Amino acid sequence: MAGAKEIRTQIKSIKNTQKITKAMEMVAASKMRKAQDRMLATRPYAEKIRQVIGHVAMAKAEYKHPYLEEREVKRVGMIIISTDRGLCGGLNINLFKKAVLAMREWHDKGVEVDLCLVGNKALGFFKRLGGNVVGKVNQLGDQPRMNDLIGTIKVMLDAYDEGRIDRLVLVENEFVNTMTQKPRATTLLPLVPSEEDELKHHWDYIYEPDAKPVLDTLLTRYIESVVYQGVVENVACEMAARMVAMKSASDNAGDLIKELQLVYNKARQAAITQEISEIVSGAAAV
């Protein structure tokens, strides 16, 4: 058994760590509420543009935009949104598992995958994995801006326009609630409506002055908005996961302190008993 002094030092060290985790928990809780507000503020625009794009995808326009046409998949582009920092539980690991599983499925079909990475954690992980990284952006902070993402998104859109990739997939975290964040993979390009949507569709758009410039701008804005929404939502996921992880760490530290306090009391009691025994033995010898 360790001595009372060593145990006391351990208890002090754990208490200091507990103070840090509690502070991080409170900071994450505060930032999470702000991140949720930003996420909710961006959703109406994202949902509306998704609705418009859904209608456009079903329209029978004379000009068929390349983003609306499905083609044989020889190479896939994948945008993966992670965090810049750790200490957020299994948020990034679960996301990477989802991405790696999707990559393996494509590789099994003989399809190569190009990666565009958002966040330091994804960059570090997929570089170690040996992934083909063609674009990256990090250090977006707790209040990401669209302008910081446009250059990275353009790399993938240019690759799609030039035929270097035939499908664009977004891998992100979905904010379900404070306790639950789920990784998901969504196909961004091509935009192909389902058969059910086509059966419900009974109208069309008239484009002025011309369909091409309207669709070029609208579809690009759509992709940018979806990726930006994913980044904003990922910040909320990060803060929620960090808050839960730090609360768990604080609770575990409290349990460990209680256990060490019990061990300390036993060690102190044993030392006192030994001292009394030595005093009694000495008195008897005299």
Swiss-Prot record:
It is found in: Cell inner membrane. One of its GO terms (biological process) is proton motive force-driven plasma membrane ATP synthesis. It comes from the Bacteria. The keyword Kinase does not apply. InterPro entries: ATP_synth_F1_ATPase_gsu, ATP_synth_F1_gsu, ATP_synth_F1_gsu_CS. Pfam families: ATP-synt. GO terms for cellular component: plasma membrane; proton-transporting ATP synthase complex. Keywords: ATP synthesis, Cell inner membrane, Cell membrane, CF(1), Hydrogen ion transport, Ion transport, Membrane, Transport. GO terms for molecular function: ATP binding; proton-transporting ATP synthase activity, rotational mechanism. It is a peripheral membrane protein. Produces ATP from ADP in the presence of a proton gradient across the membrane. The gamma chain is believed to be important in regulating ATPase activity and the flow of protons through the CF(0) complex. Belongs to the ATPase gamma chain family. F-type ATPases have 2 components, CF(1) - the catalytic core - and CF(0) - the membrane proton channel. CF(1) has five subunits: alpha(3), beta(3), gamma(1), delta(1), epsilon(1). CF(0) has three main subunits: a, b and c. NCBIfam families: ATPsyn_F1gamma (TIGR01146), PRK05621.1-1 (NF004144). This is ATP synthase gamma chain. The gene is atpG.
